[in-house]
């Protein structure tokens, strides 16, 4: 399976004072998986095999619930093409 990019914006329904704390738990989990990722101010973009990345999205929902969110809204963007696509080929010239 070709390399793709998945961006995840996760919005757990928790008290404002806990929002960053819960999102940080999700980012820590993403980091622990070993996939290439970049954290942005509005979303985290990951690079890898689509099945692996979608499993990470699923687990990220579960982490929010485990952390006390009554509801989780997520916006997921997928960039997938034959032959694969990397974050570097899209934004490398800006680094």
Swiss-Prot record:
This is UPF0045 protein CPE1503. Belongs to the UPF0045 family. It comes from Clostridium perfringens (strain 13 / Type A). It comes from the Bacteria. GO terms for cellular component: cytosol. Pfam families: Thiamine_BP. Coiled coil: none annotated. InterPro entries: MTH1187/YkoF-like (IPR029756), Thiamine_BP (IPR002767), UPF0045_domain (IPR051614). Gene3D superfamilies: 3.30.70.930.
């Amino acid at each position: 399976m070709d390399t793709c990019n998945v961006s995840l914006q996760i919005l757990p329904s928790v008290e404002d004072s806990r929002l960053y704390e819960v999102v940080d738990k999700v980012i820590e989990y993403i980091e622990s998986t070993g996939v290439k990722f970049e954290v942005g101010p509005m979303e985290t973009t990951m690079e890898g095999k689509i099945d692996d990345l979608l499993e990470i999205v699923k687990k990220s929902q579960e982490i929010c619930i485990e952390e006390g969110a009554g509801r989780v809204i997520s916006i997921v963007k997928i960039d997938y093409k034959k032959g694969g696509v990397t974050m570097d080929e899209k934004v490398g010239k800006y680094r």
